[in-house]
């Protein structure tokens, strides 16, 4: 028998505890006991006749035609939204989409996403819910305001998403960095931090922020066994986990040197079984808040995502949103729902498989070039098993100018500026650290998601030329781990 989540109200921040439901949201739920149709003078809604947007037409790939050639698809679906027309099957009322909307999200889209969550994660407690967000960065801020008071300590990976650092710092968060290896966050490091916590610093951290799959910036992916260990530690030390998963569906097979993936496309059920289980799917208590985004799956400009968690957390997040961002864009929700309804659950899985395949090809192509040119005496990296990034460490022992007594972060910035002069842009490792002055290693993050294939080789050549100028290079032969 599936039970409700545990009571985690003691984790709520002072802001969350102080927030009440907005009066206008409650007003909309009040109905006449007689069932009479009400004539409303209550809401200050603009009249639809004065909406300047009257019609919107979109195109998207037709189900079964997801493979693109030079940015075009063999068959596309044309959909038109008209403010005066009655909505057809699979379309939302466009006039209502342009009006002030429900803070949780448009009900039809919320319903589709909930079914998607049931198929993939099958939450193991009864009272879970979702809240539409404006993407994962917005979702993270909601979660922080839900859980964190000014001055609280929050656990993160040693290297983490820079926007998360910025969002936390503005809320007065004190960062506690957990060590990592090529597989991601180390449970042993987390255990040591929590077990040996110095109470003079304040209460032990009760929030952990992690990107478990295709981690940004390292590209690491937590194994199932490690995810279970993290959850066990969360239970032991009463930690709420914020699971940020924009790259979850971009999991990849092993790299073997060939360009095209060996695995052939399969049915939706087989595809879903190939994915490492999420922390949400392993959570039986309701202590995981999962962030999903359509930015990597549909387009970043939709500014749509969703938060999944226990209903108490979601209710309090909704209260924050009601006086902050309110509902996400009704236009974007309408467009997204038209696509997802047309494709259906199986079709959406097929689209996710196409993305997985496409980015695996990109990863393989980039690794082929990196293996060819990057000297293994200086450049150290592991094959990313998901996501969009290759994380390259530079061996400090081979730095030519070690007698200059520069700090690691200074050397890293020196190389970064030299790369810019050579016409190649990567991202410094220190940009992903809450406390870059403590850096002891040089890293650069490469995104293989956006550059043209034909630019991979020239870009890596330029990077290698800078390496040769700053490091003593012994070998160029590499067998990628």
From Swiss-Prot:
It is found in: Cytoplasm. GO terms for biological process: aromatic amino acid family catabolic process; lysine biosynthetic process via aminoadipic acid; tyrosine biosynthetic process. Keywords: Aminotransferase, Cytoplasm, Pyridoxal phosphate, Transferase. Its cofactor is pyridoxal 5'-phosphate. Pfam families: Aminotran_1_2. GO terms for cellular component: cytosol; nucleus. It catalyses: an aromatic L-alpha-amino acid + 2-oxoglutarate = an aromatic oxo-acid + L-glutamate. Its EC number is 2.6.1.57. The keyword Membrane does not apply. It comes from the Eukaryota. The keyword Transferase applies. It is an enzyme of class 2 (transferase). SUPFAM superfamilies: PLP-dependent transferases (SSF53383). One of its GO terms (molecular function) is 2-aminoadipate transaminase activity. Has aromatic amino acid transaminase activity. Belongs to the class-I pyridoxal-phosphate-dependent aminotransferase family. This is Aromatic amino acid aminotransferase C1773.13. It comes from Schizosaccharomyces pombe (strain 972 / ATCC 24843) (Fission yeast).
């Amino acid at each position: 028998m599936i039970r409700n989540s545990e009571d985690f109200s003691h984790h709520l921040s002072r802001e969350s505890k102080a927030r009440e439901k907005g009066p206008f949201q409650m007003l909309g739920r009040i109905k006449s006991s007689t069932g009479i149709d009400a004539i409303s003078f209550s809401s200050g809604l603009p009249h639809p006749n004065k909406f300047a947007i009257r019609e919107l037409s979109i195109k998207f790939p037709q189900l079964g035609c997801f493979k693109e050639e030079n940015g075009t698809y063999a068959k596309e679906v044309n959909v038109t939204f008209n403010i005066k027309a009655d909505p057809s099957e699979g379309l939302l009322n466009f006039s209502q989409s342009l009006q002030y909307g429900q803070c949780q999200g448009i009900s039809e889209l919320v319903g589709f996403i909930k079914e998607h969550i049931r198929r993939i994660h099958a939450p193991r407690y009864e009272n879970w819910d979702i809240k539409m967000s404006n993407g994962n960065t917005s979702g993270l801020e909601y979660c922080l305001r839900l859980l964190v008071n000014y001055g609280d300590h929050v656990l993160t990976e040693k290297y983490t998403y820079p926007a998360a650092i910025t969002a936390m710092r503005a809320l007065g968060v004190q960062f506690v960095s957990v060590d990592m290896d090529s597989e991601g966050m180390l449970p042993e490091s987390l255990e040591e931090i929590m077990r040996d916590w110095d109470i003079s610093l304040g209460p032990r951290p009760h929030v952990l922020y992690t990107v478990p799959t295709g981690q940004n910036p390292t590209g690491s992916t937590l194994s199932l066994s490690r995810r279970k260990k993290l959850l066990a530690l969360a239970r032991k030390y009463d930690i709420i986990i914020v699971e940020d998963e924009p790259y979850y569906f971009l999991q990849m097979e092993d790299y073997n040197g060939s360009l095209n993936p060996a695995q052939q496309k399969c049915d939706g059920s087989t595809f879903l079984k190939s994915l490492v289980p999420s922390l949400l799917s392993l959570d039986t208590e309701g202590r995981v808040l999962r962030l999903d985004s359509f930015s990597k799956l549909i387009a970043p400009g939709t500014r749509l995502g969703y938060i999944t968690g226990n209903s108490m957390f979601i209710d309090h997040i909704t209260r924050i949103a009601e006086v902050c961002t309110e509902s996400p864009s009704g236009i974007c929700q309408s467009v997204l729902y038209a696509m997802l309804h047309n494709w259906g659950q199986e079709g959406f899985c097929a689209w996710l498989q196409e993305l997985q395949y496409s980015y695996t090809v990109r990863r393989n192509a980039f690794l082929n070039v990196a293996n060819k040119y990057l000297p293994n005496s200086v450049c150290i990296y592991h094959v990313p098993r998901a996501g969009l990034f290759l994380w390259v460490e530079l061996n400090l022992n081979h730095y030519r100018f070690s007698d200059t007594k520069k700090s690691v972060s200074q050397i890293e910035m020196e190389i970064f500026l030299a790369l810019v002069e050579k016409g190649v842009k990567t991202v410094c490792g220190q940009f992903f650290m809450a406390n870059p002055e403590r850096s002891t290693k040089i890293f650069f993050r490469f995104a293989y998601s956006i550059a043209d294939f034909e630019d991979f080789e020239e870009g890596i050549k330029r990077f290698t030329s800078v390496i040769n100028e700053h490091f003593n290079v012994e070998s160029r032969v590499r067998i990628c781990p």
